[in-house]
Curated annotation (Swiss-Prot):
[4Fe-4S] cluster binds at residues 106, 131, 191. Gene3D superfamilies: Nitrogenase molybdenum iron protein domain. Residues 249-268 are annotated as: Disordered. It comes from Oltmannsiellopsis viridis (Marine flagellate). Component of the dark-operative protochlorophyllide reductase (DPOR) that uses Mg-ATP and reduced ferredoxin to reduce ring D of protochlorophyllide (Pchlide) to form chlorophyllide a (Chlide). This reaction is light-independent. The NB-protein (ChlN-ChlB) is the catalytic component of the complex. It is found in: Plastid, Chloroplast. This is Light-independent protochlorophyllide reductase subunit N. PANTHER family: LIGHT-INDEPENDENT PROTOCHLOROPHYLLIDE REDUCTASE SUBUNIT N. It holds the Pfam family Oxidored_nitro. Its EC number is 1.3.7.7.
Amino acid sequence: MRNTVLNTLNAFPTQLGSNKSTLSSKIFHSYLGVLRPPTPLNTSMEVLGEGAHQNREAKRSSLRFEFCSALKECQKGKVPFGSSLRLEAAENLTFECETGNYHTFCPISCVRWLYQQIADSFFLVIGTKTCGYFLQNAMGVMIFAEPRYAMAELEEGDIAAQLNDYKELKRLCLQIKHDRNPSVIVWIGTCTTEIIKMDLENLAKLIEAELKVPIVVARANGLDYAFTQGEDTVLASLVNRCPSSHESSLDSMKLPSGGREKQINDVNTSKPEGYLSEVISLTSNGDDINKKSCTKPVPKKSLVLFGSVPNSVQTQLTLELAKQGINVDGWLPSRYSELPVLNKDVYVCGINPFLSRTATSLMRRRKCHLISAPFPIGPDGTRRWIEKICTVLNTDKSSTSLEEVQKNLQQREEKVWKSLQSYLDLVKKKSVFFMGDNLLEISLARFFIRCGMIVYEIGIPYMDRRYQAAELALLEQTCLEMNVPLPRIVEKPDNYNQIQRIRELQPDIVVTGLAHSNPLEARGVTTKWSTEFTFAQIHGFANSRDVLELITRPVRRNQNLDALGFTSLVKN
């Protein structure tokens, strides 16, 4: 990956700002074979080379050149936002798909935050030395901290099928049970287990039956598009272990876990004698009892939220819904003995945009009802998220109650926006470019546009349009309300092409992964690590300030450098 990144940046100039006129007049795409002369808009472009792929890429480049010119005119203030410069190609959201490399973390990094979120659990990563080195670097802890995760290193004998996988995994799980006594063991499959076709599911069933410890298998390997999809895989596996009723949940808690019996005493079994006669004597006649017993109770609409966030964020979102009269019946993930009940009467709603597999498992396997809502990132997204849940789960269908909820949320959102005014002044009319890393790009771009920023391009490794339909609709609505051109969404972006587009657009901030951050900074491009948005608390009204704190940090850094007389961080 290192050589690929360096070769990608060879064509990048050392200082972008030193030769803007040359860059704007003549831009050479060596990879695509496209030479772009200084011609006016809507003119034909000469394509050097053969093949339909080059013609298609040349057409995309022409449309992108028009789009970039319109954005620059709007940004300079020559033409007001939302005027006739809104090109025909950008009236609707434009989706493009490239075949770029995925310079991102491995999805097994989900162990870093899930082992803390699922209490009394133990994560066993089954992979090679490379996986172990990655976990040591990405999840380094103190020696005496005793983390609840480990690495099962595959050797040559395992890959060549000379060793018995069942005996080795049973030995490791028996040692984990003896040392840590977990309530559940989660096996994390890697690329190697996929390539050699290890049957982890059947092995887990056999070992679970012998050790009496639940074993969940999640194939969070590096064959996915983004590292955040590791959490999606683990949650989709946990969906199958959730009970279908409260009785089955009690039975699951009675199962032996870690060699110790967890007894649950049912308080309803110890009723005093004559209890039923006392209840009957308090009623006027027996006919009323028969009528009441014949009426079927209205099924309660249960709400389960899925997505891994810190406990403080869970409390904040739960309280926000409680203010509107909505009770949260469970969270996924949670402690194994406290997994929520999932059946056809349960409504589920996600809080992260990278949980499409979990949403599919909830609907198809457990017959739950998915609430399609924008994600609670930023004041605008949090308000729409709560409004959609209240609209679906509000038992009182009167328009007065819904209008009151919308009024309260609107006042709350306006109050939050006023508290963020100091950050909004910094980011207003700043341009941002997303290279794509963690699948949070659509939600973050929508929030930044609402803050007054201009988003040139949203690169995203993978996107499920059905799962993010509400978020995409809100993004389009936000652009119309803010009178800014709609950004282009590029799925699986090619890094070389992105470098050329960054050279054309010259954005103020580039949100990128760790692989490209330092090389771009060395070329004079202000960057922001997308990984920071993954691990920061960005959900809900209260955490909107943290999102703006992250995106304005490079802006404030550049302002401080200007005050000190420095023009860049790199020595000329």
